[in-house]
A protein has these predicted regions:
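PLP-dependent class I/II
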Residues: 1-129
């Protein structure tokens, strides 16, 4: 047995908590927050960010934004777009390692207020004409 499959005290208690009634309630609450965040992001992107496309994620809380049309229309590279988001405090991830030439990955596993704040910043400072 290696240390990768050995259970320590912390992981044992985490496992017990995860399968408790409270753990199930927490997962239900988490799923509701994630669904709210995903629906909000998809609607806002479709309505406010022309040239950016995204599909509803399946089994994850990561969005994969296709910025190909937006970058082309605004004569920006994906690097410039990514840096613009980071400059206003939106930390997102380059999509190229995930086979998206002009894509950005965005994590939505945050409180809804933070997701709204991030998209307001993107709308006001990054995805502008």
């Amino acid at each position: 047995m290696t240390h990768y499959n050995a259970m320590n005290v912390l992981s044992m208690h985490a496992l017990i908590a995860a399968y408790s009634k409270e753990g199930m309630e927490w997962v239900d609450q988490l799923r509701a927050v994630l669904e709210t965040n995903i629906s909000y992001a998809l609607t806002l992107i479709q309505r406010e960010f022309p040239g950016v496309s995204v599909s509803r994620p399946q089994g994850t809380y990561m969005l994969f934004l296709d910025c190909t049309q937006w970058c082309s229309a605004h004569h920006q590279t994906i690097e410039e777009l990514q840096k613009a988001g980071i400059a206003v405090g939106v930390i997102w991830q380059d999509g190229r390692p995930f086979h998206g030439a002009c894509h950005i990955r965005m994590n939505l596993a945050l409180p809804h207020s933070r997701v709204k704040e991030a998209f307001e910043r993107l709308k006001q400072y990054v995805f502008v004409d």
